[in-house]
Design a protein with these regions (language model features):
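Charged, terminal alpha-helix-loop-beta segments
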Residues: 1-225
Length: 225
């Protein structure tokens, strides 16, 4: 508070950086998986900008609970929900990004390690969330696109994005998985990749692209699919 009063902004920023460093150390030391994912999300935001394959523009986006845009899916023919006629929820997506090559809006679900692939909030559950809210609901897709265009506009005004950055709203939103390897050696990474593919097959979501992230590298690259 005293730094703010003296308008010593350089010292204020330096002190804030120290506080943020302590915050990220605290996150690293937490055992809860979701906190590790939030830490990874932060690193992804820093690493994925207009100079890379994807520009991340938003995190933890929740689909509106308004009637026109809520998740509403009838998955009776989908093996991942046998016997269920109607399933409704308000899904939240980890990452919203724009692919810089074609300006397509992308929903990206981040997974850290093999334990994150199954059960509640597993890859099948995330596929359901996308299919029931965006892929099958034009109103939901339009709502999200318009909201992200507003985010882009605000970031341009704040000089966080270049003036010529845009979303191609004619292209349908794409769903992608991002998987962060726990292993560092090639044999371990191959085993994780094979396990991911098996879980994709079990969850009937083989049609979605997976971008793999090496340990300590948070750049989303289409060459790592």
């Amino acid at each position: 508070e005293s730094l703010k009063k003296t308008r010593d902004y350089k010292t204020f920023i330096d002190e804030m950086k120290k506080l943020m460093d302590k915050y990220w150390i605290w996150l690293y030391n937490e055992k809860h998986r979701s906190l590790h994912e939030k830490d990874t999300q932060h690193a992804l935001c820093i690493s994925n900008t207009e100079s890379t394959d994807y520009t991340i523009i938003d995190l933890e986006f929740q689909v509106s609970t308004r009637k026109d845009c809520i998740y509403h899916y009838e998955p009776s023919s989908i093996p991942r929900h046998p016997g269920v006629d109607v399933y409704e929820k308000s899904p939240r997506f980890d990452i919203i990004a724009v692919r810089n090559s074609d300006r397509r809006l992308c929903v990206i679900e981040l997974k850290n390690g093999l334990d994150a692939l199954v059960g509640k909030s597993g890859i099948g559950d995330h596929a359901d969330s996308f299919e029931g809210s965006i892929a099958k609901n034009p109103l939901a897709e339009l709502m999200i696109t318009k909201e992200m265009e507003k985010v882009v506009s605000d970031k341009k005004r704040l000089k966080l994005l270049s003036d010529d950055f845009y979303i191609d709203e004619k292209l349908p939103i794409e769903f992608i998985y991002a998987y962060a390897f726990k292993s560092e050696d090639e044999n371990g990474k191959k085993a994780e990749r094979d396990s991911f593919l098996r879980e994709q097959e079990k969850a009937c979501c083989m049609n979605y692209k997976v971008i793999y992230l090496n340990k300590g590298d948070f750049t989303l690259s289409d060459s790592n699919c």
